Amino acid sequence: MIEKEYLKRIGENITKFRKQKGLTIKEFGYRCDIEKSNLIPIEKGRINVTVLTLLKMAEALEVDVKKFFEFD
């Protein structure tokens, strides 16, 4: 799998978990202290995300960070 595909799938998983929690992008950003303008490209798989950012997002969503890397 190429890098862009990994980023896209990670972003899709983040979006899935955010929606399962019933959070808007704005609410999610508030919970993980990340600007909405930075979250949108992450969820769309357009930018490479740091481990620290992924950990903050997982904590805000109350999921194990490994879940972001589970691809069906």
Positions of predicted regions on the chain:
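A short, Lys/Arg-rich alpha-helix, primarily the initiator
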Residues: M1-Q20
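Residues within the helices of the helix-turn-helix
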Residues: T15, K26, L55
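The alpha-helix within a helix-turn-helix
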Residues: R18, G29, A58
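Short alpha-helical DNA-recognition segment
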Residues: K21-P41
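Residues in the helix-turn-helix
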Residues: N38, N48, K67
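Short, basic-rich loop-to-helix N-cap that marks the start of a DNA-contacting helix
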Residues: R46-K56
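Short C-terminal boundary/hinge segments that cap the last helix of small helical domains
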Residues: E62-D72
